[in-house]
Amino acid sequence: GTRYSHSDLNNTLTALEALYYSRHLVKDAPDAGKDLNWKAAIEFIQNCQNLKSHNKQPWVSDDPENKGGFIYFPGKSMAGVAKDANGRTALRSYGSISYAGMLSYAYAQLDKSDPRVKAVREWLIKNYTLEENPAMGAQGLYYYYYLMTKALTIYGTDMLELPNGKKVDWRKDLALKLMGNQAQDGSWVNQKSARWWESEKPLVTAYSLISLSLIHRGQ
């Protein structure tokens, strides 16, 4: 279902999510077969992260704007490129894919104390906003909300402390944002960008309802 001839983080996330939530079905099955190569999966995830301590590819940047965040696949960012403080071309980290990376680490059962998880969490807190998908504007905004809810929920994050010391109740803020964006017919749609099918009401409504359901459950 992709025009690329290789893996990307979004499709990897989808596969890992399916395996994570079905793992109990095969745990004790005598004919379960060979387990996933989790080491290779984690290596691919970290190879999409702007974090030189764990990703040795030449494009990786540890500049303050990008360190810890994620890109779509090794060597490609949907947010494009930018010059860092040293004049070097950096692949820009962006919001939705960074939550995808954080969530992928969760499905691979990396603890929140792992430096890779801590690094992406720090980038996401630094760039926290509900007004846009960081570095992508309105593009993929509801997918950003959806992944934010899943990633912060699975890691048990109740409050976010921003760099200025302000504490944010992200569940309350996101719930209010989503309820305020609901259309008269009960649906949701991205009014500002059609990219990634966010002009399609069924898809965006699903993102929104799943997010609200997880927020309501609180865990």
Spans of features found by a protein language model:
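An alpha-helical repeat/solenoid feature that recognizes helix-turn-helix modules
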Residues: 1-176, 180-219
